């Protein structure tokens, strides 16, 4: 038995683990690089699907390109970003991205990924949903671990169109928000300033509430 939407939203937000929004965080070697990537996304009007290539390796199984999101709170995103910096990943996540309502993405085909040993689970499921598989391998024999479960990842096949009113933009600081508002064409695309979310403010807000 389900619950009403308002109850679902209240429960989800009170848990401070997931969110009613799914977040597409942007990777980049610097804040400047990630901000410029964000601008290109906004100017194109799409999140482009890919095979999510990392270290010259496609992380998406099968032949279906996807757009990746995370079902996480801002606190959890901060931990993910901090962890990537600790691992010294050149193309790590930055505090820039796009958020879209989870229910709309779900309606359009987005689903949580399946964390499991890829070679085992792919023998049990249809090839048409290989795109949902993310390899999980905690190999105590070799002490070589592959574990992305902290990302709480969702994926959706194909490009995702950014429709006015149905997305929010994440920028790192107030300074980047002011800069974004004055970029050519942004006032028309992002009609409400409240739809530009300042990452550091959201994290600070949660610290004050705790």
Spans of model-derived segments:
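NAD-dependent ADP-ribosyltransferases
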Residues: 1-210
């Amino acid at each position: 038995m389900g619950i009403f939407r308002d109850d679902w939203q209240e429960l989800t937000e009170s848990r401070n683990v997931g969110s009613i929004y799914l977040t597409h965080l942007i990777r980049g070697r610097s804040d400047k690089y990630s901000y410029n990537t964000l601008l290109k996304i906004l100017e194109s009007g799409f999140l482009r699907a890919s095979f999510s290539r990392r270290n010259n390796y496609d992380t998406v199984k099968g032949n279906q390109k996807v757009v990746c999101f995370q079902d996480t709170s801002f606190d959890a995103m901060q931990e993910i970003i901090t962890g990537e910096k600790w691992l010294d990943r050149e193309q790590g996540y930055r505090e820039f991205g796009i958020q879209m309502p989870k229910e709309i993405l779900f309606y359009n085909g987005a689903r949580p990924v399946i964390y499991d040993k890829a070679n085992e689970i792919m023998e049990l499921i249809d090839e048409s949903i290989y795109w949902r598989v993310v390899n999980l391998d905690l190999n105590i024999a070799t002490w070589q671990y592959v574990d992305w479960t902290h990302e709480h990842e969702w994926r959706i096949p194909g490009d995702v169109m950014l429709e006015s009113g149905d997305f929010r933009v994440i920028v790192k600081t107030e300074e980047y928000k002011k800069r974004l508002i004055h970029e050519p064409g942004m006032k028309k695309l992002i009609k409400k300033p409240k739809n530009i979310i300042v990452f550091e403010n959201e994290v600070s807000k949660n610290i004050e509430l705790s």
